Amino acid sequence: MLIYKQNNLIIYYNREFCNQNIKFQITDTERFRKDTKIMKEQTMQKVHSLFTGWNQTIIWSCLDGTMGQIIVDDDSNPQSALAILGINSAFAFFAGKPNLNLITTAVNACSDLIMVPQNTEWANMIEKYCGDQVRKFTRYATLKDTKFNIPRLQLNIEKLPPEFQIHSIDANLYDQCLQKEWSTDLVGNYSNYNEFKKLGLGYVIVNDQSIVAGASSFSSYQNGIEIEVATHPDFQRRGLATIACSQLIITCLDQSLYPSWDAHTEISLHLAQKLGYQFAYKYLAYEIEE
């Protein structure tokens, strides 16, 4: 990991994949004090303890150094921590003792941001600082031990109409995903195709040489991915998302990866349940209103 200091915060991130990190860390690099030491094992244990029991793969991505950053208030004895991941759109998870500096850092890092507080104290601080800038809403977590019905998923894939084709995301399709706003998040958290190929995984459905739907990795962690699914508005309600997700899930299982699903809406939760996922719990989140 590389270590930088900014505004009395300590920022840790993966050296190899630093280019995919949050914008403020790229643009302000020259202002940081570079420190070549590796995060002390004792410090990392304390950071892990701040997030104990929080079964969110984006947090796992940051903690295991695959993607994203861990930002803490103190290098030797952290009391507050932020796990943040994303480029065009980002998630920020706040743990430990509420710290306004961590909230302002996250808000300034990305305009398309979802913030998740660990407790009421964090939530109150977010609401007080952000005011009308944020929208409070409910997200839906699923269990992380789903036993999928593979034959049923295969049947979903076989329902693909003949005028559509499903492809794994290659370099050309990666670039195509970035050209449209609705499909950007399918690959947008990987700074280039080589990073996506190494860490990510995804499928798109094509009609007349244009991408119309897809299911891919929003993020990656050591043992799996967090699923992102998107469909062009003109092609919704045709079962294309179900088909793309079914193919992605099967491929993940073939590669011993867990395809995690965290639902933004009840509609997303219903799709997840259709694919075999089981609801775990609701949780509070805040979205920056652009």
Regions picked out by a protein language model, each given a short descriptive name:
Residues 111-119, 252-264:
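Conserved GNAT acetyl-CoA-binding A-motif
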Residues 4, 11-16, 26-32, 68-175, ...:
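Acyl-donor-binding surface of acyltransferase catalytic domains
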Residues 194-224, 228-232:
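A conserved beta-strand-loop-helix scaffold within acyl/acetyltransferase catalytic domains
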Residues 62-78, 194-203, 225:
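A short helix-loop-beta-strand connector motif used in the catalytic cores of GNAT acetyltransferases and
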Residues 24, 32-56, 148-193:
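Short amphipathic alpha-helix that is part of the acyltransferase structural core
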Residues 122-133, 264-282:
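Conserved active-site alpha-helix within GNAT-family acetyltransferase domains
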Residues 100-103, 237-250, 270, 274:
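Conserved acetyl-CoA-binding loop-helix of GNAT-fold acetyltransferases
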